[in-house]
Curated annotation (Swiss-Prot):
GO terms for molecular function: protein kinase inhibitor activity. Residues 311-369 are annotated as: Disordered. It comes from Gallus gallus (Chicken). The keyword Nucleus applies. This is p21-activated protein kinase-interacting protein 1-like. Negatively regulates the PAK1 kinase. PAK1 is a member of the PAK kinase family, which has been shown to play a positive role in the regulation of signaling pathways involving MAPK8 and RELA. PAK1 exists as an inactive homodimer, which is activated by binding of small GTPases such as CDC42 to an N-terminal regulatory domain. PAK1IP1 also binds to the N-terminus of PAK1, and inhibits the specific activation of PAK1 by CDC42. May be involved in ribosomal large subunit assembly. GO terms for cellular component: nucleolus. The lineage of its organism: Eukaryota, Metazoa, Chordata, Craniata, Vertebrata.
Amino acid sequence: MELVAGCYEQILFGFAARPGEPWTVTPDFTHHAHTASLSAVAVNSKYVVTGSRDESIQIYDMRKKVEHGALLQHNGTITCLEFYGTAHLLSGAEDGLICIWNTKRWECLKSIKAHKGHVTSLSIHPSGKLALSVGTDKTLRTWNLVEGRSAFIKNLKQNAHIIKWSPDGEKYVTVITNKVDIYKLDTASITGTITIEKRISSIRFITDSVLAIAGDDEIIRFYSCDSQKCLCEFKARENRIKDIYSFEREGQHVIVTASSDGYIKVWNLDLNKINNVPSLLCEVSTKARLTCLAVWLDQASEMKENCGKAATSTEANESEKPSAVKKKKVCGMNKSGKLTKQRRRIVPAKRKLEAPLQKKKKKKQNSSE
């Protein structure tokens, strides 16, 4: 298990977390990942990908602990990244594009002009057939991923900056400043609203009906999507929480938080006692201004992500081809808005992710020298 976090200082941190009594966290690598601050991170069973204000997406092979390459399709800050299974990645950026990537060959299958403004967030339905996105054009858009086209557009009163499907795919939520609107899939109508005092920075479904919410303060809150009531709240850190991640391990529900003062904390949540404050399992300080967080889970260790998605049969039939190549045909939008084939460089890289340097103590010189 690897805790991976990005920061304003352009660094990707990796910490090896080992469950036990107690849990332990040890530094694994610190990697100068980008030439600007990191803005997004996503994981699947093999890769970690990071997005940045430098407009690139960096790929890391976590099994080999090496850089795998860079995707240079977008012309704007990467705002959101999400894997579907082992075969596809979706990326969104401030250029208004959503790109669909084949992760076997790392080629762009389709590049869609999704929003007139920035793409602020996207989320893939557990079936892999639909995706939702929100942007700075005050729209919520539904995408048919089978055909790669827009299926539905809903106008919003304000710009939403987060959208998320529930694990069962029966509902989804949008976040507008400090408000969470809960939608039902079959009616596409709002069934409830949750409002907190400060701007919401991150949300995560713990179960199909329990939502973890982090605002621009130090508090994590658990809300029921059915009653919109707060089930529990606890102080995770002295500074504001930037991101939340959750997963399930051998029946144990684990929450990981990253705060702006550089702390990553791992918590144990008892779903049978959801009103109780989660217990702290371990913590580590990066001494950096963290921006994004994920947990890479090696499937060989019999762990499964809380909101994990099974690969489809079409993904299983994907042919294995070399993934790190110097050039690939990728898709782009021309000035008329039509889909075009372009040749963009996918930069291959095999540098190892380096372990943090240990400071050596200087030996005192003898006064006679």
